[in-house]
Swiss-Prot record:
Disulfide bonds: none annotated. Component of the ATP synthase complex composed at least of ATP5F1A/subunit alpha, ATP5F1B/subunit beta, ATP5MC1/subunit c (homooctomer), MT-ATP6/subunit a, MT-ATP8/subunit 8, ATP5ME/subunit e, ATP5MF/subunit f, ATP5MG/subunit g, ATP5MK/subunit k, ATP5MJ/subunit j, ATP5F1C/subunit gamma, ATP5F1D/subunit delta, ATP5F1E/subunit epsilon, ATP5PF/subunit F6, ATP5PB/subunit b, ATP5PD/subunit d, ATP5PO/subunit OSCP. This is ATP synthase F(0) complex subunit 8. The keyword Transport applies. Residues 35-54 are annotated as: Disordered. Subunit 8, of the mitochondrial membrane ATP synthase complex (F(1)F(0) ATP synthase or Complex V) that produces ATP from ADP in the presence of a proton gradient across the membrane which is generated by electron transport complexes of the respiratory chain. ATP synthase complex consist of a soluble F(1) head domain - the catalytic core - and a membrane F(1) domain - the membrane proton channel. These two domains are linked by a central stalk rotating inside the F(1) region and a stationary peripheral stalk. The chain crosses the membrane at residues 9-29. It comes from Danio rerio (Zebrafish). One of its GO terms (molecular function) is proton transmembrane transporter activity.
Amino acid sequence: MPQLNPKPWFMILFFSWVIFLTIIPTKIINHIQPNDPTQVDAKEHKNDTWNWPW
């Protein structure tokens, strides 16, 4: 019964985990943050107070 021979199944399992642990995480990391964030220029906003006569 060839399905009981562990040698080919072990290689399939091993190579599938190698692909899972090496190739897939790098592809996921590249899609999480594809570009480096750029800092937006910090501008002070003009905050005028309202002088309402109460």
